[in-house]
From Swiss-Prot:
<comment type="similarity">
    <text>Belongs to the peptidase C2 family.</text>
</comment>
<feature type="region of interest" description="Linker">
    <location>
        <begin position="237"/>
        <end position="251"/>
    </location>
</feature>
<comment type="function">
    <text>Calcium-regulated non-lysosomal thiol-protease which catalyzes limited proteolysis of substrates involved in cytoskeletal remodeling and signal transduction. Proteolytically cleaves MYOC at 'Arg-226'. Proteolytically cleaves CPEB3 following neuronal stimulation which abolishes CPEB3 translational repressor activity, leading to translation of CPEB3 target mRNAs.</text>
</comment>
<feature type="binding site">
    <location>
        <position position="343"/>
    </location>
    <ligand>
        <name>Ca(2+) 7</name>
    </ligand>
</feature>
<feature type="binding site">
    <location>
        <position position="337"/>
    </location>
    <ligand>
        <name>Ca(2+) 7</name>
    </ligand>
</feature>
<protein>
    <recommendedName>
        <fullName>Calpain-2 catalytic subunit</fullName>
        <ecNumber>3.4.22.53</ecNumber>
    </recommendedName>
</protein>
<dbReference type="Pfam" id="PF00648">
    <property type="entry name" value="Peptidase_C2"/>
</dbReference>
<feature type="binding site">
    <location>
        <position position="383"/>
    </location>
    <ligand>
        <name>Ca(2+) 1</name>
    </ligand>
</feature>
<dbReference type="GO" id="GO:0005737">
    <property type="term" value="C:cytoplasm"/>
</dbReference>
<dbReference type="GO" id="GO:0006508">
    <property type="term" value="P:proteolysis"/>
</dbReference>
<keyword id="KW-1003">Cell membrane</keyword>
<feature type="region of interest" description="Domain IV">
    <location>
        <begin position="252"/>
        <end position="422"/>
    </location>
</feature>
<feature type="binding site">
    <location>
        <position position="45"/>
    </location>
    <ligand>
        <name>Ca(2+) 4</name>
    </ligand>
</feature>
<keyword id="KW-0645">Protease</keyword>
<dbReference type="Pfam" id="PF13833">
    <property type="entry name" value="EF-hand_8"/>
</dbReference>
<feature type="binding site">
    <location>
        <position position="313"/>
    </location>
    <ligand>
        <name>Ca(2+) 6</name>
    </ligand>
</feature>
<dbReference type="GO" id="GO:0005509">
    <property type="term" value="F:calcium ion binding"/>
</dbReference>
Length: 422
């Protein structure tokens, strides 16, 4: 008789057919064997005949539990490291290697393999480890009509010049010029993809992804290793290289002075509403940027950023600085728009922010896309400018409140509310 032992992970219901805990069939088994195999506990673990198993089950999925699940408390050979992450449409859901323009935007994790296996069973030295990529919450999503995503992962060797660093998110050029050292056997729409590898000691980048880009999802990555392996997320540190414009009125040429006098009128200042009209006329002449001008909200936050005297308007010097910034914004927007569509998609936005001097982690890119992209993941020129101005303003405020560069500030309620309505 062939028997199979099964565990119900919820531990509430057990098999009641042949060879269940109370089945008289156990009376025909040697008492010592019966005592060892048939412990009677309501623990969700039970025996059934293999023929009954084949009759009652039509599909078998291997569930990879943690390495110590079926061992005693005193013996745990394999080490487990676990990390949770997510893919977000338009920012961190870059799809597989078939999509080189977006693949690099997937979450990245560094695995440091330091010690070789003690027993080299196949005669080949190296570090043995398993990588399991699990989709989370898919049962919940299935109730909403969504099926499992098709998932997989790639493993890349970290270049020597970048080893030891965890604050650099590897970019598009790296993946265009570097082959994967290992990868999952396949991309498949199962809850978990798991593969076993052996690699020399060193640092490796793990990139989990869905097969196609723009698939929202949460995941868990588990790394099982015979020896301890360091495993952590790789992401850009927050940086802002903001050029402080030190402009005096003597630096402003006569042509710009005449232009300003013509635009500003008798009060010699430009309000947000006047600025909106000016920019509408200027941008209407551009064929390479699709825009109807800038919204009054964007114009107001631009005025607020540069209004040093609190009048709510821009004087000559302030307007000159703003005009220089707008020209810079136009240049970046045009250069990043590689398909010459006159617009920018959310994936191009990450590169545009870097060109503007901002390095941001994935979490912030997710927030920016949610805030400034439309449902087609397009970021128009108005939202692009508004995003840059808000970021610059927030960085400058933080710097003023943190003169010692500690990376932390304290705010009272009124200050928090004032900054929140920017």
């Amino acid at each position: 008789q062939k028997l199979i032992r099964i565990r119900n992970p919820w531990g509430e219901v057990e098999w009641t057919g042949r060879w269940n805990d109370n089945c008289p069939n156990w009376n025909t088994v040697d008492p010592e064997v019966r005592e060892r195999l048939a412990e009677r506990h309501e623990d969700g673990e039970f025996w059934m005949s293999f023929s009954d198993f084949l009759r009652h089950y039509s599909r078998l999925e291997i569930c990879n539990l943690t390495p110590d699940t079926l061992t005693s408390d005193t013996y745990k050979k394999w080490k487990l490291t676990k990390m949770d992450g997510n893919w977000r449409r338009g920012s961190t859901a870059g799809g597989c290697r078939n999509y080189p323009n977006t693949f690099w935007m997937n979450p990245q994790y560094v695995i440091k393999l330091e010690e070789e296996d003690e027993d080299q069973e196949d005669g080949e030295s190296g570090c043995t480890f398993l990588v399991g990529l699990i989709q989370k919450h898919r049962r919940r999503q299935r109730k909403m009509g969504e099926d499992m995503h098709t998932i997989g992962f790639g493993i890349y060797e970290v270049p020597e010049e970048l080893r030891g660093q965890t604050n650099i998110h590897l970019g598009k050029n790296f993946f265009l010029t570097t082959r994967a050292r290992e990868r999952s056997d396949t991309f498949i729409n199962l809850r978990e993809v798991l593969n076993r590898f052996k690699l020399p000691p060193g640092e490796y980048i793990l990139v989990p992804s869905t097969f196609e880009p723009n698939k929202n999802g949460d995941f868990c990555v588990r790394v099982f290793s015979e020896k301890k392996a360091d495993y952590q997320a790789v992401d850009d540190e927050i940086e802002a290289d903001l050029e402080e414009a030190d402009v005096s009125e003597d630096d402003i040429d006569d042509g710009f002075r005449r232009l300003f006098a013509q635009l500003a009128g008798e009060d010699a200042e430009i309000s947000a509403f006047e600025l909106q009209n000016i920019l509408r006329r200027v941008l209407a002449k551009r064929q390479d940027i699709k825009t109807d001008g800038l919204s009054i909200e964007t114009c107001k936050i631009m005025v607020d950023m540069l209004d040093s005297d609190g009048t709510g308007k821009l004087g000559l010097k302030e307007f000159y600085v703003l005009w220089t910034k707008i020209q810079k914004y136009q240049k970046i927007y045009r250069e990043i728009d590689v398909d010459r569509s006159g617009t920018m998609n959310s994936y191009e936005m990450r590169k545009a922010l870097e060109e503007a001097g901002f390095k941001l982690p994935c979490q912030l890119h997710e927030v920016i896309v949610a805030r400034f992209a439309d449902d087609q993941l397009i970021i128009d020129f108005d939202n692009f400018v508004r995003c840059l101005v808000r970021l610059e303003t927030l960085f400058k405020i933080f710097k003023q409140l943190d003169p010692d560069n500690t990376g932390m500030i304290q705010l009272d309620l009124i200050s928090w509310l004032c900054f929140s309505v920017l």
